[in-house]
Amino acid sequence: SMPDIDTDFDDEGRQKVIDYVVDKYGKEQVAQIVTYGTMAAKSSIKDVARVMDLPLSESNLLAKLVPDKPGTELNRCLHAPLTVKEGEKSLAEREGYQPEDIDNVKKLREIYKGNDLRAAVLHEAERLEGSIRNTGIHAAGIIIAPSDLTEIMPVATAKDSTLWVTQIEGSVIEEAGVLKMDFLGLKTLSILKTALELIKQNHGITIDLDLIPLDDAKTFNLYQRGETNATFQFESVGMQKHLRDLKPDKFADLIAMNALYRPGPMAYIPNFIERKHGRELIKYDLTVMEEILSDTYGITVYQEQVMLLSQKIAGFTKGDADVLRKAMGKKQKSVLDKMKAQFVSGAVKNGHPENVLEKVWTDWEAFAQYAFNKSHSTCYAYLAYQTAYLKAHYPGEYMSAVLNHAGSIDKI
């Protein structure tokens, strides 16, 4: 399949690129991509309650009983095991519900079993959950077709755009034979551009950001102090705390932190920090894993690491490894189950113990929930480093550029 092509431009440059693409290929061959919004657990309850004339106060109370965890499914709230494993994972295991969440789910189930209007609302909401509620336009996706799009797929006009909008969503659109690219407008690039102009104006210096050293002491001191306000990707309070503990001293540390600081992998940040400073033993399930995991102190952080390990341990081809990467990224359980058998048999042939392989695969399945690619993390860490470099060496000009692009008085 085609690679996933994401490109970032400064805010002003993005529209120029889109105009160029339209001019090169023709308006009939370029379109934006539709998005379909579906009814989630809480919204389905509120929508059904409104139609069935359940008072707003009762509707809100009903919706509040649904836990706030992202991805919560009403169907599982109403029917899945609460805390004991009974063939399928319980709400406590899979969703990670806390005792308070479980108590609310129990109340929800009691109402569901009743025969009043609230019960009727829950039954209808369960049936409608996942239905398409509205449409929108993908924030960055652009389609380029080899011929007139109307001959390939249904399209529509959009209220706020001169481009057509596809009626097939992005996850499957390439199967229609078109190229999908993401053109993102990134304010950070505009900030860098303005900062460089101010530095030239004030100091008579022209800086080429592609040539700045990646081991600059002043920049890493800024990271180690956690003084990263207004720098790209590293400005949150939580990240600043981790930076002060980590004390990064090489670019690879920034790449890893950029990948780890997200829901899911954040749990591994304390281990990453302790291992970097030698306060926690670095362990490898198999000795051959050290070569690939040593940069991240034995913790699997990137999709590329899994790809390389599957080739090294089980003799996967590059093609097999890429299928594994995609299955992890898209959480395709059926594909992962097939690849597990291939992985275990291939690794056993290479002399690795089956019980250890089971653990490795289980860890990878958990990793699949937050799998991140190193190439993306590297690009963003590089951009982040450029902002930190300018802040460390030219704080006045850099912060002026940040304020110029703040967009609102509240942000300033």
Residue ranges and their predicted role:
Residues 1-412:
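Noncatalytic, beta-rich nucleic-acid-contacting surfaces in large DNA/RNA-processing enzymes
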